[in-house]
Amino acid sequence: MSSPAPSTQAFSLKTRQPIPDEDALLTEEDRILKQATKGEDCTTRRRACKNCVCGRAELERKLEAEVLTMPPGGCGNCSKGDAFRCAGCPFLGQPAFDATEDGKVKLNLTDDV
């Protein structure tokens, strides 16, 4: 067996190129800060406005109804915790619970002292 032919380098580590000035890369248009206009609409808030006309309120109501009607997961690991739950589990992000409690979380409200 023969050794492979030496490859030619596409770059050299010995030559140093100067670091370009960041300010020289910007144009005058880039330097002008554009002020964002803030309006009173649903896009600036997390929830829909009281008098919502963009359709966000209807979408939120639809999503709430879907979440309430979600069936328990079919993998059987819903009660064990996030490490064991499947990707489509409706209990994802919630703490582990007893499987006989139907997804209700029991909090320990006693003092640790």
UniProtKB/Swiss-Prot annotation:
Biased composition (Polar residues): 1-15
A GO CC annotation given for this chain: mitochondrial intermembrane space
Chain positions of motif Cx2C motif 2: 86-89
Region ranges (Disordered): 1-22, 33-113
Short motif Cx2C motif 1, span: 75-78
Predominant place of localization: cytoplasm
Region (Fe-S binding site B): 75-89
Compartments, record wording: Cytoplasm; Mitochondrion intermembrane space
UniProtKB keywords: 2Fe-2S, 4Fe-4S, Cytoplasm, Iron, Iron-sulfur, Metal-binding, Mitochondrion
Binding-site positions, [2Fe-2S] cluster: C42, C49, C52, C54
Transmembrane segments: none
Cofactor: [2Fe-2S] cluster; [4Fe-4S] cluster
Gene Ontology BP annotations: iron-sulfur cluster assembly
Gene Ontology molecular functions: 2 iron, 2 sulfur cluster binding; 4 iron, 4 sulfur cluster binding; metal ion binding
Residues holding [4Fe-4S] cluster: C75, C78, C86, C89
Residue ranges of the region described as Fe-S binding site A: 42-54
Domain notes: The C-terminal domain binds 2 Fe-S clusters but is otherwise mostly in an intrinsically disordered conformation. The twin Cx2C motifs are involved in the recognition by the mitochondrial MIA40-ERV1 disulfide relay system. The formation of 2 disulfide bonds in the Cx2C motifs through dithiol/disulfide exchange reactions effectively traps the protein in the mitochondrial intermembrane space.
Family affiliation: Belongs to the anamorsin family.
Function: Component of the cytosolic iron-sulfur (Fe-S) protein assembly (CIA) machinery. Required for the maturation of extramitochondrial Fe-S proteins. Part of an electron transfer chain functioning in an early step of cytosolic Fe-S biogenesis, facilitating the de novo assembly of a [4Fe-4S] cluster on the cytosolic Fe-S scaffold complex. Electrons are transferred from NADPH via a FAD- and FMN-containing diflavin oxidoreductase.
Subunit structure: Monomer.
Protein name: Anamorsin homolog
Annotated source species: Leishmania major
